[in-house]
């Protein structure tokens, strides 16, 4: 979940990861290097995925009824963000194996990537017809309801999922998202603390807790959570990006610029980091009456817009 706050004509963006990362999809012209960065793979790993795609395509050509091959193709296409192809392969899997829960779950997640929430919910309800107590189905139905603004319905699904699986920290993060959207920040904090109690190494929970603290004006507490997230994953670009905003809020623009450059070094295609760096440059420029810094700020905003347009 991304939050954007306009200040002095600059976009201030702070990240609260809730469900899935904001990936690009078909139609996006990305270099292999940029694609690798987007999906967290190396270029050599992408080449291995391509080899597997070729191999499984050969399998389905030889045997169109090979449900497992179609399923594996769906997984590989999903990894490459070829979502239309992934949808097609998962649908073929379901035709061949009508009781396949895993194919339906994966299909629903791809629908969500394409903002096809109605289709996602419909597919997940098919899962519940097969297995009424499927935790993932309740979680992901809740996620689609949340994404479409059906907060009470989302809350009901997440609570049902939690009844079925009390030790799933992710569900607490989902509940936090709903409570945050309802303005129930104390409840949001409570859910994130429960997630961290279950899994102290859950970096997303620390990131989101930092986000809620930031919204509450508790800057020191927010910084502490971001530092914990980075301690868990030193390459967690979102945490560096959010940390930069805390520095901006404290008027520590040099520190903000330094940490935001670190975020971009880790993930050059993270939109929020570019937006936030532009925000830091802009505010430092206003403070120092520096036209060159304003140019740097606008360049970062241009990069940000290009990246958002590519998603």
What does each of the following model-derived ranges do?
Residues 67-68, 101-102, 135-136, 169-170, ...:
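Helix-start (N-cap) detector for alpha-helical repeat units in TPR-like alpha-solenoids
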Residues 20-72, 76-81:
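N-terminal leader/linker segments that initiate helical-solenoid repeat arrays
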Residues 27-40, 47, 275-311:
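Terminal, low-structured helical/coil segments at or just beyond the last alpha-helical repeat
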Residues 44-58, 80-92, 102, 113-126, ...:
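Structural signature of tandem alpha-helical TPR/SEL1-like repeats
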Residues 10-17:
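Bacterial N-terminal signal peptides
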